[in-house]
A protein has these predicted regions:
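Catalytic-pocket segment enriched in acidic/His residues
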Residues: 206-257, 261-263, 272-277, 283
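HotDog/MaoC-like acyl-thioester-processing domains
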Residues: 1-37, 79-82, 99-183, 249-252, ...
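Hot-dog-fold acyl-thioester-processing enzymes
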Residues: 1-101, 161-234
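Hydrophobic residues on conserved beta-strands that form the core of alpha/beta folds
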Residues: 39, 149, 239-241
Length: 302
C-alpha cells in the first residue's frame, strides 16, 4: 500500500547532517503495524563526470576500455534512494535495512560528459521469509529517451512480509572458478569515497559490530560491479541486463571466488562464493542481449 503522491527535485548532494538527522528520526519512530509506503517521486539531473567514473571503475575492476560501468547510474541515484528512506513519512528506519536484490538494465550506450535525468520512485511491499521487503525503482533518461532502469529491493528484518515474493535466482550449472578476489580491509572506506555510501557496517569495525558483524563487510553493489567487470567484454556496453541476489555478507579480508559457466552467454548465471565453496555471497544473472519485451523494473503500485 502506498500513500499520497509527491514529486520533488533534488540536484544538491545529500549532506552528512541530513543523513544523521534522518537516521536518528527513523530510529526514534515506531514502525506502524500496517506500514504505508509514501508515494514519492524524486528527480535529479546528473552529469557523467569522467574523473568520478574513472575512480569508481578502477576500484570495481573495470578497464578503461569498458567505458561507463552499467552500475554507475545506480550510484548517481543512491542519494535519491537515501532521501526517500530517511524521510519523515517513511515507515522503516534506514538504519538496519538490508539490500537483498538489485536489477539493472541498460538500453543504450552511456558515455562520460553526458547528462542524465534520474527519477526514483517508491515501489511496492514485497514478501520475504526474513521480514518485510520493499522496492525502489529508478529510470534514467537522456534527451527524453530511457537509457537505463534499476530496481533495488531492501529488507526490514522481522516477521515474514506481505506482497509478491522477492525474486530468487537458480545456481549456475557446470560453473567453474573464473577469478579469485581478496577485498582489502580498507575497501569499505574506499568504496564509500567513490560511491557516497558510507554505511558504517562497511567502513568501521565498531559500526560493523553494532550490527552483529565481527568486522566490516563489503558493499553488495561493489561485489556485483566487480563480477560485471569480469564477465562483460572489454568494450562499452550497448545493451545489457544484470540481476543479483545478495545472499550473505562478504567480510573484508576474506578470499572469495567468482564462478560461472564460460563463455558468457544470454541469461548466463553466476555466483560469488567463499573460497571453500560452502557459502554463496551473491547469485546473479547476466544478459548481454536483453529482450525489449521482457519485464522492466517495477514502478509504483498500491
Amino acid at each position: 500500500m502506498t500513500g499520497n503522491g509527491l514529486v520533488e527535485r533534488f540536484d544538491a548532494p545529500l549532506s552528512g547532517l541530513a543523513v544523521v538527522g534522518g537516521a536518528v528520526r527513523g530510529l526514534l519512530r515506531k514502525t506502524p503495524a500496517q506500514p504505508v509506503l509514501p508515494r514519492r517521486t524524486l528527480r535529479r539531473e546528473a552529469v557523467l563526470e569522467a574523473q568520478a567514473i574513472e575512480a569508481y571503475a578502477r576500484l570495481c575492476g573495470f578497464s578503461p576500455e569498458q567505458g561507463v560501468p552499467i552500475t554507475w547510474p545506480h550510484i548517481l541515484s543512491f542519494p535519491l534512494q537515501m532521501r526517500i528512506m530517511l524521510g519523515a513519512d517513511f515507515p522503516y528506519p534506514a538504519v538496519g535495512l538490508v539490500h537483498v536484490h538489485n536489477r539493472i538494465r541498460q538500453t543504450a550506450r552511456i558515455e562520460a560528459g553526458q547528462r542524465l535525468n534520474l527519477t526514483t520512485r517508491v515501489g511496492s511491499l514485497l514478501a520475504h521469509d526474513k521480514g518485510q521487503a520493499f522496492a525502489l525503482t529508478t529510470e534514467a533518461t537522456r534527451d527524453g529517451q530511457t537509457v537505463w532502469e534499476g530496481k533495488s529491493i531492501y529488507l526490514k528484518l522481522g516477521p515474514k512480509g506481505r506482497g509478491a515474493t522477492v525474486p530468487e535466482l537458480d545456481a549456475p550449472s557446470g560453473a567453474s572458478v573464473l577469478e579469485t578476489w581478496s577485498p582489502a580491509p580498507d575497501l569499505g572506506r574506499r568504496y564509500a569515497a567513490v560511491s557516497g555510501d558510507a554505511n558504517p557496517i562497511h567502513t568501521l569495525g565498531l559500526g560493523a559490530r553494532l550490527f552483529g558483524f565481527r568486522r566490516p563487510i563489503a558493499h553488495g553493489m561493489w561485489t556485483k560491479a566487480r563480477a560485471i567487470a569480469a564477465l562483460t567484454p572489454q568494450a562499452p556496453l550497448e545493451t545489457a541486463e544484470v540481476e543479483a541476489v545478495f545472499r550473505s555478507p562478504v567480510f573484508l579480508g576474506d578470499t572469495i571466488v567468482l564462478q560461472a559457466a564460460p563463455p558468457v552467454r544470454t541469461n548466463n548465471l553466476f555466483e560469488v562464493r567463499d573460497m571453500g565453496g560452502t557459502r554463496t555471497h551473491l547469485r546473479g544473472r547476466l544478459n548481454l542481449s536483453p529482450s525489449l519485451s521482457s519485464q522492466p523494473p517495477e514502478g509504483p503500485s498500491s
